[in-house]
Amino acid sequence: MSEEREDLTFAKYGTAVRELAQLVADDGYQPDMILAIARGGLFVAGSLGYALGVKNLYVMNVEFYTGVNERLDVPVMLPPYVDFVDTNAARILVADDVADTGHTLEYVRSFCEGKVAEVRTAVVDEKPQSIVKCDYV
């Protein structure tokens, strides 16, 4: 993992999320719900929800990083647990701030498989070492 960290100002964040929403819209993807990965994905998911007109937002609290450059061996879901109700036909957009190693996104995608019709991922930043290649960056 790179030691270099980028500070994202509010202005840069706003631009990044608008561009991310435009990528999703231009692709023609119309998610039925957005799943935020807490904590970094909370604001991303909320902003995408407004921009894309998606009112169904879910939150999944996954712990992988325990500090700067410190992480667990594997991601762990923390309570309260996500409970999808009658979502077999739903298209879901998973939102997070960054795909660093990609392990969190891989965990969340695996969790969603079989519970929804389609899963796509959207992040503000994707690192080169990420094992997951996100649909929208």
In which residue ranges do the predicted regions lie?
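PRPP-associated nucleotide enzymes
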Residues: 1-137
